[in-house]
């Protein structure tokens, strides 16, 4: 079913299911000793989507659920999530070392960094997502008896609505630098909403703020790869049409757009991240799926 501009979801449906899929990837990578996210598997189990639970637990293998040699599948997703998790964890460590003590995780989903990263003293973590998502995550982690490693403030609001006001009401200080993460988010926003999000982040950011974002190119080849994987997953009981979850149409390149707003962006291609982590590379043939994906870090210098 195609997305609408004001749709909602839980963690088992629509965009919410992708948050559970990503957490399943983190859980599998944790089992393989590639990252350390002890909360990922319990969160996936609590959501209750059998396919993701079995992948997280190591009960399904790529041979069971993936098309051999395909550009996308559960194992390729897990590889990408491994590289992405390490990259963004390192981003937050560097931001903390630079003295930044406000962290904003946009569309936080089942992200558990507020509980697993060693935040510097004085750090506050703001998590923004739909109310049902935040409530579920908080309740599940509380049942595990876990305590956050920094104060966490849940900002229960859709990013397509007036989230800047909600963030300020939660205690965000626009006069102090912040570290922002847009992980696996931009491609799920309509093109104009992507621009508004980056405009709002800029307006809320003091000089010296830092941003990390994943840039996913919604190309026809990428959509075909997503749909091909989904066909095999349906045989195992998972019915999520990943290509339907994005929004069609031309959109601004995030790094270029951020540069116009006063940020100093640095692009890291997906394959560079995979290579840095010793993981299999994506095809670089012209038009290959995901070949245009990259990760962007940026520092704000309005006076620049």
Curated annotation (Swiss-Prot):
Keyword hit for tRNA-binding: no
Chain sites annotated for binding S-adenosyl-L-methionine: 129, 158-159
Pfam family, one: LCM
GO biological process: methylation
MF-aspect GO terms: methyltransferase activity
Keyword Aminoacyl-tRNA synthetase included in the entry's annotation: no
Record's keyword terms, sorted: Methyltransferase, S-adenosyl-L-methionine, Transferase
The enzyme's E.C. designation: 2.1.1.-
Coiled coil: none
Stored InterPro entries: Ppm1/Ppm2/Tcmp, SAM-dependent_MTases_sf, SAM_mthyl_Trfase_ML2640-like
SUPFAM superfamilies: S-adenosyl-L-methionine-dependent methyltransferases (SSF53335)
PANTHER family associated with the record: S-ADENOSYL-L-METHIONINE-DEPENDENT METHYLTRANSFERASE YKTD-RELATED, S-ADENOSYL-L-METHIONINE-DEPENDENT METHYLTRANSFERASES SUPERFAMILY PROTEIN
Role according to the record: Exhibits S-adenosyl-L-methionine-dependent methyltransferase activity.
Family per record: Belongs to the UPF0677 family.
The protein's name: Putative S-adenosyl-L-methionine-dependent methyltransferase MAV_4236
UniProt organism field: Mycobacterium avium (strain 104)
């Amino acid at each position: 079913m195609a997305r609408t501009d004001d749709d909602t979801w839980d963690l088992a449906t629509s965009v919410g299911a992708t948050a559970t899929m990503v957490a399943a990837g983190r859980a599998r990578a944790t089992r393989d000793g590639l990252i350390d996210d002890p909360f990922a598997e319990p969160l996936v189990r609590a959501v209750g989507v059998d396919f993701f639970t079995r992948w997280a637990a190591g009960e399904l293998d790529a041979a069971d659920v993936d098309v051999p040699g395909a550009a996308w599948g559960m194992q390729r997703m897990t590889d990408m999530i491994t590289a992405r998790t390490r990259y963004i964890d390192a981003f937050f460590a560097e931001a903390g070392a630079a003295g930044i003590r406000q962290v904003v995780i946009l569309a936080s989903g089942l992200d558990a960094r507020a509980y697993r990263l060693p935040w510097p003293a004085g750090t506050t973590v703001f998590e923004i997502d739909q109310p049902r998502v935040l409530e579920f995550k908080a309740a599940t982690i509380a049942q595990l008896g876990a305590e956050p490693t920094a104060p966490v403030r849940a900002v229960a609001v859709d990013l397509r609505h007036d989230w800047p006001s909600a963030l300020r009401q939660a205690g965000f200080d626009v006069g102090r630098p912040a570290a922002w993460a847009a992980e696996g988010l931009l491609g799920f926003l309509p093109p104009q909403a992507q621009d508004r999000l980056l405009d709002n982040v800029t307006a809320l950011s003091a000089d010296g703020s830092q941003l990390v974002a994943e840039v996913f190119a919604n190309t026809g080849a990428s959509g075909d790869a997503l749909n091909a994987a989904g066909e095999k997953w349906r045989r195992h009981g998972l019915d999520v049409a990943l290509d339907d979850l994005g929004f069609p149409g031309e959109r601004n390149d995030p790094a270029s757009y951020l540069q116009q707003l006063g940020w100093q962006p640095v692009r890291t291609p997906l394959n560079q991240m995979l290579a840095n982590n010793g993981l299999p590379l994506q095809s670089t043939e012209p038009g290959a799926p995901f070949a245009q994906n990259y990760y962007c870090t940026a520092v704000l210098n309005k006076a620049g």
